[in-house]
Swiss-Prot record:
It is an enzyme of class 2 (transferase). PANTHER family: AROM/DEHYDROQUINATE SYNTHASE, PENTAFUNCTIONAL AROM POLYPEPTIDE. It comes from Helicobacter pylori (strain HPAG1). The keyword Transferase applies. Its EC number is 2.5.1.19. It is found in: Cytoplasm. CDD domains: EPSP_synthase. One of its GO terms (molecular function) is 3-phosphoshikimate 1-carboxyvinyltransferase activity. It comes from the Bacteria. Pathway: Metabolic intermediate biosynthesis; chorismate biosynthesis; chorismate from D-erythrose 4-phosphate and phosphoenolpyruvate: step 6/7. Catalyzes the transfer of the enolpyruvyl moiety of phosphoenolpyruvate (PEP) to the 5-hydroxyl of shikimate-3-phosphate (S3P) to produce enolpyruvyl shikimate-3-phosphate and inorganic phosphate. Phosphoenolpyruvate binds at K11, G82, R110, Q157, R333, R385. This is 3-phosphoshikimate 1-carboxyvinyltransferase. The active site is at D302.
Length: 429
């Protein structure tokens, strides 16, 4: 059995640790921070808002929040990070000053009205391009009043932006979503003294009576990153893999559960539970069968491109529905997946809210064809999850990806670990 500590710290927790430190009054410590481009954007923005950041060890920082958030003299650059833009919008909506949030071309084409509308319900002064649909966003911090909001979409980023505004509003605010989304924001903030009550999926958020407590967080490995290597094991005959020190929050392992339903052998062993459950995941190859994914989409939407690779190896027709949000990620991920599969000659089709893929079960004829004829270049669309998903497919087919460097957005170690997997041995350090 191959043992792997992927050393890819959780992206969601890394973002939140930095952003939440700005609502504390004393120095906070973040250990095992994800040094991916997205999370570094959040860290740089914190510095531009007045936080002092000091290296304490490898991938670890002491963050001293400012006495009051500073009005920056320049645009706050979120680069490719939707989490940075959406969560900072919630945080800054009640802070004194003028703030402009912008990003790269991809981020500035992603939907922002989904956060602008709930923030305006508080009375926030926030504007976006093209009738509030897109960034850049301009925020003039102002006093907020509590509100009730029912979100039409299940999104941890929308929920988190709302919660960060609610903590700074006058009165108790209520948030309801149509499907459970990731709950790291609630867990972390409650541990730091925020009063957030969850009753049957409805959040009631009281304003902060005092600054958040200072914290010392050590961040576990990201299950979304670990999933790529669970997928690699599932499609590689005779493979057995132990993924170590992985965050096992129930809202984050839905993709592993889907792979398990497809036939892969997957077992969780909890090693600790402090703030969040952390443990090991055992994965073993087995023949895969088709799956229909139509529920709990918010809990696995980031992993659907990777799951599409598993679907290629499954017996039967697999289906994804109710996943329209895939079209407004870093790329149109429905189009990206299906256009690449069609270029490879795979039977598949896209819908408005998903796709189907007819599994090959036996991929050897396709491999033989590409050994005789050069296969088409796989297009990443500069989307890290598309690039990494199809990079896993290179374990079985002789394919090339047009831009695997974009994996650095969330998983800087990916290329090195993939090469080690191909060799059959790991040293995750």
């Amino acid at each position: 059995m191959i043992e792997l500590d992927i050393n890819a710290s959780d992206k969601s927790l890394s973002h939140r640790a930095v952003i939440f430190s700005l609502l504390a009054q004393k120095p906070c410590f973040v250990r095992n921070f994800l040094m991916g481009e997205d999370c570094l954007s959040s860290l740089e923005i914190a510095q531009n808002l007045g936080a002092k950041v000091e290296n304490t060890a490898k991938n670890s920082f002491k963050i001293t929040p400012p006495t009051a958030i500073k009005e920056p003299s320049k645009i706050l650059n979120c680069n490719n990070s939707g989490t940075s833009m959406r969560l900072y919008s919630g945080l800054l909506s009640a802070q004194k000053g003028l703030f402009v949030l912008s990003g790269d071309n991809s981020l500035n084409a992603r939907p922002m009205k989904r956060i602008i509308e709930p923030l305006k319900a508080f009375g926030a002064r926030i504007l976006g391009r093209e009738d509030n649909h897109f960034a850049p966003l301009v925020i003039v911090g102002s006093p907020l009043k509590a509100c009730n909001y029912e979100s039409p979409i299940a999104s941890a980023q929308v929920k988190s932006a709302f919660v960060l505004s609610a903590l700074q509003a006058q009165g108790v605010s209520v948030y309801k979503e149509n499907e459970l989304s990731r709950n790291h924001t609630e867990i972390m903030l409650k541990s730091l003294g925020a009063k957030i009550h969850n009753q049957d999926g409805v959040l009631m958020i009281s304003p902060l009576e005092k600054p958040l407590e200072a914290f010392d967080f050590t961040i576990a490995n990201d299950p979304s990153s670990a999933f790529f290597f669970a997928l690699a094991c599932a499609i590689t005959p005779k493979s057995r893999l132990l993924l170590k020190n992985v965050l096992l929050n129930p809202t984050r392992i839905e993709a592993f559960e889907a792979l398990k339903k497809m036939g892969a052998s997957i077992e969780y062993v909890i090693q600790s539970k402090d703030l969040e459950m952390i443990g090991d995941i055992y994965v073993e190859h087995a023949p895969l069968k088709a799956i229909s994914i139509e529920q709990n989409i918010a809990s696995l939407i980031d992993e659907i491109p990777a799951l599409s690779i598993a679907m290629l190896f499954a017996k039967g027709k697999s289906m994804v529905k109710n996943a329209k949000d895939l079209r407004v990620k870093e790329s149109d991920r429905i189009k990206a997946v299906i256009s690449n599969f069609k270029a490879l000659g795979i039977e598949c089709e896209e819908f408005e809210d998903g796709f189907y893929i007819e599994g090959l079960e036996d991929i050897s004829p396709l491999k033989q064809r590409f050994s005789q004829k050069k296969p088409p270049l796989i297009k990443s669309f500069n989307d890290h999850r598309i690039a990494m998903s199809f990079a896993i497919l290179t374990l079985a087919l002789p394919l090339e990806i047009d831009n695997l460097e974009c994996a650095n957005i969330s998983f800087p170690q990916f290329k090195r670990l993939l090469n080690l997997f191909k060799k059959g041995s790991f040293n995750g350090n």
